[in-house]
């Protein structure tokens, strides 16, 4: 007997229809999302299939652009991890040392602070690093032969997640948070507190950062303003004070340091941050540290280098790449950094580029400090104060660590052998001698001071001209370093002439151990000269952004920082304003307003018979490139522009295959998850190596990783 199908009821039909509609909606949304992020998905899940046809007779052609040195990703990543250890070993800066470092093997150390258990390995956005692919601080330090107090560390490791830390949501400050997340020492268990007695304290303080979000200049203000729905009151915020910013020590951090000083034999502070911080309290007084080591963001194996630095297997040779001020709020950049708004743009746009609803405002930044930023401000301010032109400025009170500063476990003696200005080049020769008892590297820093006329072209008093790092010098060994730089480098831009002007006169060339400490100096005489063409292309130079210059002269009058009167022209904090009051018009870009009726449409879709491979070895200016580009269709060009995140698709007309081009400042890492590639330490640490050759090796290593992983660029 045949089975009779039960008729569908209206209720079942409606229910099934609702489910089907929901599934269709989800499918449609998924299709839209997949299409929007197709290139990203292709990169991580595998792209569209492509085939390669070998031309007859090409069997013996050398088609490899570069020779792979490693067999696969695993081997390449292991080699890259070794370089990360080396980079951090040379890029970490020993900021202070009262004889506390290095530590002997077997020393019992107490790792303190939440960042001891939860270190900063990378940044936010494309700088995101997978912590599971990194050596943690505990294991890196233990591997160097130091005995870790597991009682204190175990408690911190079990409890740090109860204390939220800053989270940057890329390009969306409405969901970001600015917590430091440090655990007050009073919250430690009694057993953990007692366990640190008689040990050496390694207090790790950390700050994150990264793409799409600034650190807070006013923690209490940001909390009260509701700028982020996720940044809400808790025990930490109860201790915020008016004007406190994210780069100064918190009450909680000071409590840990104070406890370490009271209970431990030595207090060593490790700065796990890729930015200068206000560390004045650690230099003397209640919170004085015995040693301070800046290690930046660690990357995959930076923690092993930290252990080697602490024990002396690595001798610190890094140098700071910025001034470390005593008070950030007294810096000329502080008042005009961050998001100020034009408040009269309601209805101009509904959402910003990140699809966040507009609040009827538009951001602006007014660049009032001009050339006086970082060490160029502080060293110039010091020179003017010494000359009696900047009352109230005291360099020693304003600066904790100069630019180009760093200590070592040995001592070096530098001598300025010669300075010669011949033709278009200045040549400086210096000798470095290791006057200490252990092997180490030193950095040779050469600066110039140009003649300045009050009311003339704005010029810093001191500018870095060139640098070099020595090889590893054994105790008593010496090395002579030659540094060359073009005379043109000492010229300054003249907006009046629309060219670089090298004023005639005496230029002081100095050898320094940092931006402030002079070893020796000599003077060279230079004839006045104007450079009005680009030194590479020969293109005529001219002022750019004249409209913005006009804006600044009108709206920032008396606040454009000038060496002629630092005190009187010091920038005032920026405030929200109406664009109409500033004499500017904010309008959407309309391409039709810029259409050139006399322009000729470029050739597209031509059948010229060229393939992209035919361009191998061609000069950039070869006319064949134009012939190749004539083959592209408009759809192919727009497709490449609109679908090019982390890879680019195939282009049939020129036989371009689909290629993979990931990016990121920490190597081939990703905000979407693990990649199996190396995570490099932060650029902050790379720069602090002052070692060009080491950075070149790192660049070659990144290329080898790309070859091993099948990346094309």
Segment roles from a protein language model:
Residues 1-712:
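C-terminal non-catalytic regions of proteins with extracellular/luminal or membrane-system context
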């Amino acid at each position: 007997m045949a089975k009779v199908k039960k008729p569908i009821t209206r209720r079942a039909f409606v229910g099934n229809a609702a489910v089907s509609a929901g599934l269709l909606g989800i499918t449609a949304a998924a299709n839209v999302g997949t299409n929007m992020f197709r290139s990203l998905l292709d990169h991580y899940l595998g792209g569209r299939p492509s085939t390669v046809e070998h031309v007859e007779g090409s069997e013996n052609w050398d088609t490899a652009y570069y020779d792979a040195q490693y067999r696969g990703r695993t081997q390449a990543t292991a080699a890259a991890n070794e370089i990360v250890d080396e980079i951090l070993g040379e890029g970490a800066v020993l900021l202070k040392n009262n004889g506390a470092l290095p530590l002997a093997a077997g020393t019992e150390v107490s790792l303190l602070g939440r960042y001891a258990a939860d270190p900063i390995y990378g940044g936010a956005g494309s700088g995101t690093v997978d912590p599971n692919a990194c050596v943690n601080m505990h294991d890196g330090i233990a591997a160097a032969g130091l005995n870790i107090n597991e009682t204190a560390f175990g408690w911190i490791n079990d409890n740090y997640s109860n204390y939220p830390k800053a989270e940057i949501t890329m390009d969306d400050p409405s969901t970001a948070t600015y917590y430091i997340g440090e655990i007050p020492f009073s919250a430690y268990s009694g057993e953990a507190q007692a366990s640190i007695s008689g040990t050496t304290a390694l207090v790790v303080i950390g700050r994150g950062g990264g793409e799409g979000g600034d650190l807070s200049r006013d923690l209490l203000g940001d909390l009260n303003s509701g700028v982020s729905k996720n940044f809400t009151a808790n025990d930490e915020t109860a201790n915020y004070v008016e004007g406190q910013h994210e780069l100064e020590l918190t009450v909680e951090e000071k409590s840990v340091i104070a406890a370490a000083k009271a209970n431990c034999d030595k207090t060593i502070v490790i700065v796990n941050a890729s930015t200068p911080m206000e560390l004045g309290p650690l230099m003397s007084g209640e919170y004085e540290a015995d040693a301070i080591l800046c290690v930046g963001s660690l990357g995959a194996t930076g923690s092993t280098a930290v252990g080697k630095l602490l024990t002396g297997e690595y001798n610190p040779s890094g140098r700071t790449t910025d001034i470390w001020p005593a008070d950030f709020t007294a810096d000329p950049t502080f008042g005009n950094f961050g998001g100020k708004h034009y408040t009269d743009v309601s209805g101009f746009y509904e959402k910003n580029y990140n699809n966040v609803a507009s609040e009827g405002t538009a951001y602006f930044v007014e660049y009032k400090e001009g050339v006086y930023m970082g060490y160029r401000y502080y060293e110039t301010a010091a020179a003017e104060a010494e000359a009696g032109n900047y009352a109230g400025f005291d360099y020693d009170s304003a600066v904790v660590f100069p630019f180009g500063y760093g200590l070592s476990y040995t001592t070096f003696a530098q001598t300025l052998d010669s300075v010669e200005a011949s033709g278009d080049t200045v040549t400086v020769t210096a000798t470095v001698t290791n006057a200490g008892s252990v092997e180490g590297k030193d950095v040779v820093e050469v600066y110039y001071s140009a003649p300045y006329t009050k009311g003339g072209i704005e010029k810093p008093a001191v500018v870095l001209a060139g640098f070099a790092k020595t090889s590893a010098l054994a105790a008593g060994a010496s090395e002579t370093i030659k540094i060359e730089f073009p005379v043109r480098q000492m010229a300054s831009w003249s907006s009046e002439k629309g060219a670089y002007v090298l004023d005639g006169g005496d230029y002081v060339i100095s050898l320094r151990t940092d931006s402030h400490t002079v070893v020796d100096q000599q003077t060279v005489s230079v004839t006045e000269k104007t450079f009005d063409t680009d030194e590479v292309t020969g293109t005529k130079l001219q002022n750019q952004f004249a409209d913005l210059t006009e804006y600044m002269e009108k709206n920032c009058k008396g606040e454009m920082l000038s060496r002629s009167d630092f005190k009187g022209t010091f920038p005032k904090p920026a405030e929200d304003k109406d664009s109409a009051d500033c004499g500017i018009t904010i309008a959407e870009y309309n391409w039709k307003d810029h259409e050139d009726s006399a322009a000729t449409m470029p050739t597209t879709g031509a059948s010229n018979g060229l393939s992209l491979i035919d361009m191998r070895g061609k000069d950039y200016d070869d006319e064949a490139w134009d012939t190749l580009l004539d083959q592209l269709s408009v759809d192919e060009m727009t497709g490449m522009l609109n679908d090019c995140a982390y890879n680019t698709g195939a282009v049939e007309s020129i036989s371009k295959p689909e290629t993979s081009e990931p990016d990121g400042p920490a190597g081939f890492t990703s905000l979407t998850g693990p990649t199996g590639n190396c995570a490099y330490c932060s650029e902050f640490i790379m720069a602090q190596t002052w070692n060009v050759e080491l950075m070149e090796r790192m660049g070659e290593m990144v290329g080898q990783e790309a070859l091993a992983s099948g990346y094309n660029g």
